[in-house]
Each structure stands twice: as structure tokens, then as C-alpha cells.
């Protein structure tokens, strides 16, 4: 197992009496020293993207991962097979970058759908190319999609993404719903300047079309390291912007390990009722219930978006390691998962690897 430092200060994992940190489990679910079970696998297929969202990527000049470093379809299929059949993963989400740019997406989705037990299979996409791919992906075995959409105002969308592609995204949303990739969820990261206005229009748009809006607090994962807490909109800011326009009630259903805090929405007599979620990763962190394990496009396991270390499974794969060795390395990587992401710590330093190179 090879560990690659990311230039971040150590977030030292502490045990809470449930386990000996020196003894990594060799069977059972994928657990850490705090007793959390990771059964949700996020698989990044590429770091490339056809948008340039200001909170994620620079407008130009970002270096892509070399092609030879990216996992091949057979390598992805093998690692997902290990995760599902040996480590207890029940949900697989494909991410990027923009996963629709990965030529092997349909192939990997189909291979995942053939696994037994079959995991839930989902996709997070910017939606630009979804209109022409939704049907084929549904046939391959994809269950549902999350589409990133931060504004339905064309000028605001173009300013945030640095591309005038709103019409393509809206067409992708409609195609996903028509293909049965439901519930269709809309992920929004709000711009500090226009977000209070945008979120009202976004929620009404989603209610009218049967999509589920999820507003995500901006996290310090941009390539330009320009994130500032005092500028980014918080969950409380979002709710304050919505309350003058909608009647909101907390969803009484148990939240479990889901990242979104759900709200029931009444928009008045002319708009369907529904629900929306707020993912308050910064202001109300939910690290204690995190159930995710992450595989980057170049074959690294990350126990957390803000991990201080990565575990290199690609080297094991290409070095001839058997499934037992890969399973053991994966278990060890997750066993040392830190208690939390550390964003609120005074000595927090943003990771070198941006979100586009980790996978959402």
C-alpha cells in the first residue's frame, strides 16, 4: 500500500473506545475506528470538464491528469466488484470532473449493474451532454442522476460556469426524467452575489417539474484556493432567502446518513408541493454519520474529501496484486479515516487536489 501526501496538516484520527486502531478488520463491512460504515462508493471517471465553474476550476490553465494514470474500464470494474462483493458497498455513484466525458461510462455502468448483489447506481453530472445519453445510460443500468445547476438565469449561469450552456442542461434534465432516471435531483452551489435570488427561482422551477433541489454549501475545494467563509452563503442564508416565498417545514422522516437536511415545501395554490434539501457541509457538518469512500480517476482511495493521505490502488492493480491485497489496502485506508474534515479548525489548510480531481 502506497500513501501519497497531499501537502496538508495531519488530522489525527482518535479512537473513542470502540476499536483498537492498530488492528484493521479483515472481514465484515468497511469501517473506521469511529464505527462508521462506508457503503457508498464515489467513483471519479475523469478530472476533465466542459464547464469552468468559478468555485471549482480556473477559467484556463488547469493541468489534466495524464491519460496513462487514469484507471481503465477493466480496472474500474475490478475495483467496484471488490467494493460490492467484499466490502459491503451498496451504492455506487459515478462522478468527475464531468463523467459524461468518459468514453467508457456506459460500459462501466453496465458492468456495475451485473454485480450481485446489485448496488444502486447513480451519476452526478453537469447535464450538458445528458440529453443524448440519458436513454442509453438507463438501458445500461443507471438508476438515477443528480444534475448540477446553480441558476436558471442564463446570464447568471454563464457567469458562474463561464459557458453559455444553460439550454443544454435544461434539456438534459428533461431527458433524464423521460428516461426514468428518477428521482432527478438538482445540485446547486449558490453564487454569493446572485444566490439569494437564484435559489428562489431554482426551487420554484424544480417544484413545477418534479425535480428535487439540493443546495450545497460551497466548500474549500476550488483549484484557485479563493474560498472564504465570510463570503460563501450558509444553509441559514439559504433558508432566510426562501422563507419569504415558501412555507417550509422540516421533513419528519429520519435523516439517517443522508447528507441533506430535508424540508417540506408549500409554494401556494398554483405550484406543486414538494421537498428540498440543504447540505450544510461547512456550517453544520455531518462527518459523524459519513458513509462514503472515494475512488479518484487515477486510482487513489480517499477516506474523506479533505483527507491528508491517499492510498494508491492503481499501483497495486498494475503491480499484480490479488483481490485479497487490494481489499486489505482499501480497509486500511478507511480504518484511519479522521473524525471530521477539519474545515472549522483554526489550522485548516485547503487540499492541493481540487474537487474536479477528487470527484463529488
Swiss-Prot record:
Name the SMART domains on file. Elp3 (SM00729)
| All residue ranges annotated as the Radical SAM core domain in the record | 33-259
For whether the record's keyword set contains Nucleotide-binding, the answer is yes
Required cofactor names: [4Fe-4S] cluster
The cofactor note from the UniProt entry for this protein is: Binds 2 [4Fe-4S] clusters. Binds 1 [4Fe-4S] cluster coordinated with 3 cysteines and an exchangeable S-adenosyl-L-methionine and 1 [4Fe-4S] cluster coordinated with 3 cysteines and the GTP-derived substrate.
GO biological process terms, semicolon-separated: Mo-molybdopterin cofactor biosynthetic process
Binding annotation for [4Fe-4S] cluster 2: 287, 290, 304
Instruction: Cite the binding residues for GTP.
Output: 42, 93, 124, 185, 292-294
Positions annotated to bind S-adenosyl-L-methionine:
55, 97, 148, 219
Record-linked InterPro entries: Aldolase_TIM, Elp3/MiaA/NifB-like_rSAM, MoaA, MoaA_NifB_PqqE_Fe-S-bd_CS, MoaA_twitch, MoCo_biosynth_MoaA/MoaC, rSAM
Q: Which residues bind [4Fe-4S] cluster 1?
A: 49, 53, 56
Q: Which UniProt keywords apply?
A: 4Fe-4S, GTP-binding, Iron, Iron-sulfur, Lyase, Metal-binding, Molybdenum cofactor biosynthesis, Nucleotide-binding, S-adenosyl-L-methionine
**Any GO molecular function:** GTP binding
- Top EC category: lyase
Entry's family note: Belongs to the radical SAM superfamily. MoaA family.
Q: What is this protein called?
A: GTP 3',8-cyclase 2
Which species is this record about?
A: Mycobacterium tuberculosis (strain ATCC 25618 / H37Rv)
Gene coding for it: moaA2
Amino acid at each position: 500500500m502506497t500513501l501519497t501526501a497531499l501537502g496538508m496538516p495531519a488530522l489525527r484520527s482518535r479512537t473513542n473506545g470502540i476499536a483498537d486502531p492498530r488492528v484493521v478488520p479483515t472481514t465484515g463491512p468497511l469501517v473506521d475506528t469511529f464505527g462508521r460504515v462506508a457503503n457508498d462508493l464515489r467513483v471519479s471517471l475523469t478530472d476533465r470538464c466542459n464547464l469552468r465553474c468559478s468555485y471549482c476550476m480556473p477559467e484556463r490553465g488547469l493541468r489534466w491528469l495524464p491519460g496513462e494514470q487514469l484507471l481503465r474500464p477493466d480496472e474500474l470494474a475490478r475495483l467496484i466488484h471488490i467494493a460490492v462483493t467484499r466490502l459491503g458497498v451498496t451504492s455506487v455513484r459515478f462522478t468527475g470532473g464531468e463523467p459524461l466525458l468518459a468514453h467508457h461510462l456506459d460500459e462501466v455502468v453496465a458492468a456495475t449493474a451485473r454485480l450481485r448483489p446489485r448496488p444502486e447506481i447513480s451519476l452526478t453530472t453537469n447535464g450538458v451532454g445528458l440529453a443524448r445519453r440519458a436513454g442509453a445510460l438507463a438501458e445500461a443500468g443507471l438508476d438515477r442522476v443528480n444534475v448540477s445547476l446553480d441558476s436558471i438565469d442564463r446570464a447568471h449561469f454563464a457567469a458562474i460556469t463561464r459557458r453559455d450552456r444553460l439550454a443544454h442542461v435544461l434539456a438534459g434534465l428533461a431527458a433524464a426524467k423521460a428516461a426514468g432516471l428518477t428521482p432527478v435531483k438538482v445540485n446547486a452551489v449558490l453564487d454569493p452575489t446572485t444566490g439569494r435570488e437564484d435559489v428562489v427561482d431554482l426551487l420554484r422551477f424544480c417544484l413545477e417539474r418534479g425535480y428535487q433541489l439540493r443546495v450545497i454549501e460551497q466548500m474549500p475545494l476550488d483549484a484557485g484556493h479563493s474560498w472564504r467563509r465570510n463570503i460563501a452563503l450558509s444553509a441559514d442564508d439559504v433558508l432566510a432567502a426562501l422563507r419569504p416565498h415558501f412555507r417550509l417545514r422540516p421533513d419528519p422522516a429520519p435523516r439517517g446518513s443522508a447528507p441533506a437536511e430535508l424540508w417540506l415545501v408549500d409554494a401556494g395554490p398554483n405550484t406543486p408541493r414538494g421537498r428540498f434539501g440543504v447540505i450544510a457541509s461547512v456550517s453544520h457538518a455531518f462527518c459523524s454519520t459519513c458513509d462514503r469512500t472515494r475512488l479518484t480517476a487515477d486510482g487513489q482511495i480517499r477516506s474523506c474529501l479533505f483527507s491528508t493521505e491517499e492510498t494508491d490502488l492503481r499501483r497495486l492493480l498494475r503491480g499484480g496484486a490479488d483481490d485479497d491485497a487490494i481489499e486489505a489496502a482499501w480497509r486500511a485506508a478507511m480504518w484511519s479515516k479522521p473524525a471530521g474534515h477539519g474545515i472549522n479548525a483554526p489550522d485548516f489548510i485547503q487540499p492541493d487536489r481540487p474537487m474536479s480531481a477528487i470527484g463529488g
